[in-house]
Amino acid sequence: MKEYQPQKIESKWQKRWQDEISYETEVDHNKDKYYVLEMFPYPSGKLHMGHMRVYSIGDVLARFQRMRGYNVLHPMGWDAFGLPAENAAIENQDLPSRWTYANIDNMKDQLQALGTSYDWKREVSTCSPDYYKWTQWMFLQLYKNGLAYKKKAPVNWCPECETVLANEQVENGACWRCDSMVEQKQLSQWFFKITEYADRLDQDLELLEEWPDRVKTMQKNWIGKSQGTEIDFPVKGSREKIRAFTTRPDTIFGATYMVLAPEHPMTEQLVQGTDQEKEVMDFIKGVHEMGKEAREAEDLEKEGVFTGRWAINPLNGEEIPILVGNYVLMEYGTGAIMAVPAHDQRDFQFAHKYNLPIKEVVTPPEGEGKTESETHDELKKAYTDHGILINSPGYNGMTSEQAIEQITRDIENKGIGAGVTTYRLRDWLVSRQRYWGAPIPVLYCDQCGILPVPEDELPVQLPEDVDFSQGSRNVLAARQDFVETSCPQCGGSAQRETDTMDTFVCSSWYFLRYTTPWDNEVPFRQEDVNYWMPVDQYIGGIEHAVLHLLYARFFTKVMYDQGYTNFKEPFSRLLAQGMVNKDGAKMSKSKGNVVSPDEILRTYGADTGRLFILFAAPPEKDLDWNDEGVEGCYRFLQRLYRLVNDNQNLVDLQLDDTKFTKEDKEYHRLIHKTIKKVTDDISERHNFNTAISAIMELTNASSKYKEQKEVNESLLRTGLETIVMLLAPFTPHIAEELWETLGYQDSVHKLNWPSYDEKAMVAEEAEMVVQVNGKVRDHLTVPADSSEETIKEKALEREKVQKYISGAEIKKVIVIPQKLVNIVCK
């Protein structure tokens, strides 16, 4: 008996696909297109199970849509810049490029071993000068249109390494490499003005009907559109004013103190030369050491310090203390809040901690007419809903909605503030004081100032022979041959920018480059990009729900506005796949629960690995790795392999359903029902697990059918061929092998996807459950087209049913055609 040998079969078909360039994309703009794209990986050197899952999902869709006749674009590339390569270079005294390209080679071999159908002719690598030339071109387009600018911003600075650290490189306030305490330092940095697009990025989420709601909600929250009012509070004894932002101007009479963010420009000014200066500056230093993430945490212990200064409430003239607090961030609003502890829970907790006044100015609607504030002891928590105003001269008795409108109007008329729309979103800081990134294409000339590098001089290339012996200091700044250049405007000496770009910039447009990756004259050809885009199906982890997807949407809108493309959104449909867990926890080396794709391929083969990972859970849910489940998938493929090999010589005649026996009809019906289910599950719902389950059921039914005395060989052949075609997107190697076993020369992946016949799915008979008062008492087989009256009669005649209804009063008989009869009696 011929045994299933997956490794032998898989290497055979992978070689053939490679030799025949089977998956090169057809350039035919007249065909209907389907662009399926998985988020490209960082070339760490090894695929993990999360990779295997996402690339298996994408490959199923690519193979399925090819068989349905679409012109499919299914490319792959490498998000290849970033810190790990630079760190490896420092540790191993190697070049980041050599480390990166070695990893790419290894991961490419692994991807091909999975049986993926990528068009490798379109492969891109973001660290290649051919690619980052166009990343730099993108920067210049933003710069020309006022969307790239430079300003000072705080960074994490390691005084020992003399370099800027990313947030993730700061561990408990110390440098991850040398353990020195990290300082906050103001550096001049490049930003992209993504805030110019905040409203469109927010509004256009409505266009993304086939994105998961949770992803859209995460983006909406990150953009953080908020309607509110900015109000100027004069500083007592000064001509200065502090502008505060609030979404609840109706509570202004309840403001009992102000809180500034430690980064607020007035903080130092307020305490300079005062008794409070040292205490406040020490507090600010401590807050900076916490890091931004800790300050944004829900369970943050809210702390503050008094500046010794007072602000004046512009509507009632009350003096309120000005504090600096760790829970106020410069990124939100104006970096200053009017604190209303009676109506904001954070302010309430802070006021209790520092014994600050609490004054109620809004009461629930049913409390209308109440005029006296509750005491500290009476108010157990802040009342944060809208209500009726009290203790607010000139506004008492108004609803919150009325007061918000009126107070904002009055503030505007007095010239002490305005109604505003604000966003949580801040401009995108793209400068990185690192070597392994795309150089920012800017020059500095003493005579001419800041100048963009001329487009015909792109790319500004990274020097290859760099020295990392000094650790993580800015390598580019130390290279005079890189820094020193001439000014394109005056011809004098100039210096290059030594910062490189955030790696998110490279991944914000790669999906456009895939449409024309070999063209060195343009980043993409308009006729190609407008044909292929937007991506029909984008697939990637939920961890990219905000930043990557938001930046990609931003770049797409910029390209649209500048006339380079004709689409406003990059991804029509998004699938955020779940994690792969083992023993109830995410796979990780530290937990010792990692299963390597290489290990699965060696033991069971790629088809088994793919089948299990697609069968074990719906793609958007977390998947729990299960060795028994993998074994089960392997045994299924073994059974199928034997079934087809044992029946490879079946006759292939035209089917004549007029001669079908009852068993033939049932088997024929199941074939067509399976085609419909698998088609719908893949295309509409992406329920690969239920599609595979249906194929397994048809396989089991085929095994049973062939054991009958009278077998219609042509029908059995049809069933086996259908199974092989339906499995082809999931398990591409064994499908090719079995198709060849059945006597065909062409690739199974070049076939048309099987179609189903609605008529063939209609059963001649229906087996129905018969209930009496909701309890199952019998089963009934009737012709499928029986009328309700006929079904009622037959059900009531049943001997088993008579036993329960004899002598009873029948109230009604409920019939659900072809499924159920329920007799209700008393």
Curated annotation (Swiss-Prot):
InterPro entries attached to this UniProt entry: aa-tRNA-synth_I_CS, aa-tRNA-synth_Ia, Leu-tRNA-ligase, Leu_tRNA-synth_edit, M/V/L/I-tRNA-synth_anticd-bd, Methionyl/Leucyl_tRNA_Synth, Rossmann-like_a/b/a_fold, tRNAsynth_Ia_anticodon-bd
A Gene Ontology molecular function term of the record: ATP binding
The name this protein goes by in its record: Leucine--tRNA ligase
Organism annotation: Natranaerobius thermophilus (strain ATCC BAA-1301 / DSM 18059 / JW/NM-WN-LF)
A matching Pfam family: tRNA-synt_1
Parts forming coiled coils: none
EC number(s) on file: 6.1.1.4
Main location (coarse class): cytoplasm
Location relative to the cell: Cytoplasm
Keywords annotated in UniProt: Aminoacyl-tRNA synthetase, ATP-binding, Cytoplasm, Ligase, Nucleotide-binding, Protein biosynthesis
Catalytic activity: tRNA(Leu) + L-leucine + ATP = L-leucyl-tRNA(Leu) + AMP + diphosphate
Positions that bind ATP: K589
SUPFAM superfamilies: Anticodon-binding domain of a subclass of class I aminoacyl-tRNA synthetases, Nucleotidylyl transferase, ValRS/IleRS/LeuRS editing domain
PANTHER family per UniProt: LEUCINE--TRNA LIGASE, MITOCHONDRIAL (PTHR43740:SF2), LEUCYL-TRNA SYNTHETASE (PTHR43740)
Motif segment ('KMSKS' region): 586-590
